[in-house]
């Protein structure tokens, strides 16, 4: 599973928190990998966000519930974490921290820095067959086909 920006955030949350899968009667084994691009992995203090997103509401506990970083499973699936080298600084930092946390739990993690891509142009890489993301994504998926 994967996505860009909010889509990458939701994919990562689904990959590391199996409660959503349980709610729909789906085994965790269906998620064989996660490929977020320019995703948010953490909300709240220390996240680097300059303001609280409206969708979190006013409940402080919602930051934790919405943060893949705070919902990591004991054995997370493989991840290919990508972001642009000119992406928002907090997303670059969060991607690196999240990758390190996943590795500590034994996950197979690859990081891909998309040269000269901003947050917005990083999304285009997902559709460029000869671009910087597609070949790595295909190799990642083949490796984790199961």
List the predicted regions and their residue ranges.
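Mobile cap/lid helix-loop segments that gate and shape the active-site cleft of serine hydrolases
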Residues: 16, 39-71, 77
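C-terminal catalytic histidine-bearing segment of alpha/beta-hydrolase fold enzymes
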Residues: 82, 92-99, 103-146
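Loop/turn elements at helix/coil->beta-strand transitions in domains of secreted/extracellular proteins
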Residues: 30-32, 77-78, 107
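Primarily recognizes the serine-hydrolase "nucleophile elbow" in alpha/beta-hydrolase
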Residues: 1-49
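Short beta-strand/loop motif that positions the catalytic acidic residue
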Residues: 75, 81-83
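Short, conserved loop/helix-junction motifs that constitute active-site signature segments
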Residues: 27-29, 72-75
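Cell-envelope and extracellular/periplasmic
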Residues: 39, 83-84
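Acidic catalytic loop of the alpha/beta-hydrolase fold
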Residues: 43, 86-90
